[in-house]
Structures are given as C-alpha cells and as structure tokens.
C-alpha cells in the first residue's frame, strides 16, 4: 500500500505522516528524487506499506494509476493553522492578516486545489485538543487501514469495489440519466456478475421528457393520481430492455430505490431471483410481501460514498 498525503498549509500533514511512519511502521519515500523513481520503487515494493508527501499534481497523476495507491488529504480550521504558523520563526513578525494571506496564497493555487480535490480519503481535523486529536488520528487511521486492507478482498486492489458496490454505483449512474421531475431512480439487472440491462425513470421514447413538461402529473407536483403518470419506472425500463429470456435464472436486480408495488409484480413475473436496493420507499411493506411470497431474496445495501470524509 502506498498512501500519498496532501493538505492545506499548516493543517497537520507532517503529524499524519510521522504517525504513519512511527506508529504504523510505514516507509517514507520522500527521499527519492523524481516521480519515475518513486513510481518504480513503489511498484516493486507494492506489498509494503509506504507513505509520501504530495505537493505536485504531476506526481499524483502518475501514482493514482496504480491500484495499490490511496490519496489522503488533510484539512483543519483556520484558527488551528494560524496557531501552528505562529510557532514557526518565519511568522514571528507577521500580523494575523499577513499569516492568513500566506495561507491563502498556498491553498488557492489552481494546482493545489486540483490536487486535494482528487483525494480518496479526506481527514477534517476539528478536535482542538492536541492530545485528543492525536488519539483520534490513531483510532481513525487504524479504522481506515483495516477497511483498505480487508482480507476478504483476497489481495484485490485497495479501492476496488465489491460486486454489490460496483452494481449499485452503476444503478446510481443510470439514475443520473433520469428525466423525471419527481425523483431520480436507476436500475441494473445482472446475471453471473454480468450486466444484462440498465434503466432509469422518465417518459417513454419519442415523448417529450418529463422535465420539459412531458408528464403533466409529475410537473403538477401532485403525489396522487399515479395512474395518470406517463413516466416509466427505472425497473420497468430495465425489465423491458432485458426481456424474460435474457433475464433467465439467478438474475439480480439492483435499484437505488426500493421497487414500488407495481414494479415488484413485474419483477416477479420476469423471473428475477434477488432484489438489492439502497434507499427505502413509502411502499416498502407491500413490495416486500409480494417479492418474498414469490421466493425472491430482498436485501438493502448502500455503498461507501467517495471521497470518504472522516472527522478527526
């Protein structure tokens, strides 16, 4: 594992790096001369735990291609950073305004902004007590290292999602194509870890998009009169795209919102074996009853949002 650490000026990057080296026995790689040398060394020693301080976007762009790389960014309140700055000899004669200007000059360089925004993990240091902050850092680093070094992944790349996370993310991506005024919903149908069909909610093909006035019921803001809605549900779209023959046996339907009752009936008829959903819906109980009576496995799953934000 190689962890690259970046952060705002005087946010505590050095403390985090020193902790990884001293407490968690990571090897510091900042003694290496150039990006190619760093990349070559890290690749040859990818089974070892290493850490490097990231200052240049060009270095990040090389390292982030490797599956064993994790980017951690650090940030802290301005008051904490000003206090740390005052302890340095270069800040002895500076006013508060001058210190803040120096911090801003570092933090708001375009390259630095892009660098920090590309992090996988973001530690927000909010604990003002130094001793409490240190213990919180140890606890949270321990937790995140356990997640990254999950033995169940069987040597898989650090940030590689599980199948459930992968397909639920695809369902969420499909939802971004929704044209419905009410809500965005996405769906993916999978068999043997292969995508059969995707779908999102909105008006049928050749009709005006819902957000352009294509469905009067949705644009009216009325939650009643569902029978007048012209929008297809995400599950319906995916099921129509797949068809019963392509669904076959042991297919799983991933949906970022629990299927409604009418979609549940169609899911049963199409032969889906399992339904995995992320968010609840007001008709959950009726849907569960239909699906479970048909012998369909139903479970809730939510993937970890990225970047992962951790309060210290």
From Swiss-Prot:
This enzyme's EC code(s): 3.5.4.12
Main EC class the enzyme belongs to: hydrolase
Cofactor: Zn(2+)
The organism of origin for this protein: Saccharomyces cerevisiae (strain ATCC 204508 / S288c) (Baker's yeast)
CDD domains: deoxycytidylate_deaminase
Positions with a binding annotation for Zn(2+): 233, 260, 263
Start and end residues of each CMP/dCMP-type deaminase domain: 162-291
GO cellular component: cytoplasm
Pfam families xrefs: dCMP_cyt_deam_1 (PF00383)
Activity regulation info: Allosteric enzyme whose activity is greatly influenced by the end products of its metabolic pathway, dCTP and dTTP.
GO MF annotation, one: zinc ion binding
Name of the featured protein: Deoxycytidylate deaminase
The protein's role, per its UniProt record: Catalyzes the hydrolytic deamination of dCMP to yield dUMP, the nucleotide substrate for thymidylate synthetase.
Family indicated by similarity: Belongs to the cytidine and deoxycytidylate deaminase family.
Cross-referenced PROSITE patterns: CYT_DCMP_DEAMINASES_1 (PS00903), CYT_DCMP_DEAMINASES_2 (PS51747)
Key words of the record: Allosteric enzyme, Hydrolase, Metal-binding, Nucleotide biosynthesis, Zinc
